[in-house]
Amino acid sequence: MRVDLNCDLGEAFGNYSFGGDHQIIPLITSANVACGFHAGDENVMNETVKLAKAHNVAVGAHPGLPDLKGFGRRNIDISNDEIYNLMIYQLGALQGFCRIHQLKINHVKPHGALYQMGAKDREIANVIAQAVYDFDPSLVLVGLANSYLISEAKNVGLITASEVFADRRYEDDGQLVSRKESDAVITDTDEALKQVLKMVKENKVISKNNKEVTLQADTICVHGDGEHALLFVSKIREILMKEGIDIQSL
């Protein structure tokens, strides 16, 4: 049994910094690097790619909507052409920094509202997937398990990785509970660990209404901007190793 452990990183911007990237990155196998639209900038991207290489961590693109103030978590009325173009633009930016460090982008995981839009809207998911395929058909598209991001990526011919979340609660249909709700984020370490083991070992998660939902767990996400991110990552890694589960990049 194997699973990838990923984290969204490189989300500082200019003089604004948060998250414990330097402490987290040695503990994970895949880094989703912000590409400048929702967070990150040219200096942060370069430093994050360099850091990932130093720790032999797979580098993935983490493109988002152009919404720095909202951290890419607010829905924006945007056309399919704009979605396609912003995907290509951000992938190209990260590819430049990967190239100077003799690395290759390994995977793509949309951020925040763009991720949720693709998970719930088949047409948007197809646009995202097509952009990734056109940029590089060998890339892995990471998306919410059982969502349109996964099915549409497969339809266009991409390799996929179904993602589950250690620090988020689930609806009965397998979607994530909206961050607008007070109970959307899991802050208790024991609860997060229990959820992770059930998802990885049983391919199931218990929804907020106590319903058992089936899902595929190829990669586990912990949000790098979370208050307990470093603690969660270290404890998840520890318990996976204790259970004999291999932690490998996608």
From Swiss-Prot:
GO terms under biological process: carbohydrate metabolic process
Coiled coil, from the record: none
Catalysed conversion reaction: 5-oxo-L-proline + ATP + 2 H2O = L-glutamate + ADP + phosphate + H(+)
Origin superkingdom: Bacteria
Pfam (any one): LamB_YcsF
GO terms of molecular function: 5-oxoprolinase (ATP-hydrolyzing) activity; ATP binding
Keywords in alphabetical order: ATP-binding, Hydrolase, Nucleotide-binding
Keyword Glycoprotein part of the UniProt annotation: no
Family of this protein: Belongs to the LamB/PxpA family.
Subunit structure: Forms a complex composed of PxpA, PxpB and PxpC.
Protein name: 5-oxoprolinase subunit A
Species per Swiss-Prot/TrEMBL record: Staphylococcus aureus (strain JH9)
Name of encoding gene: pxpA
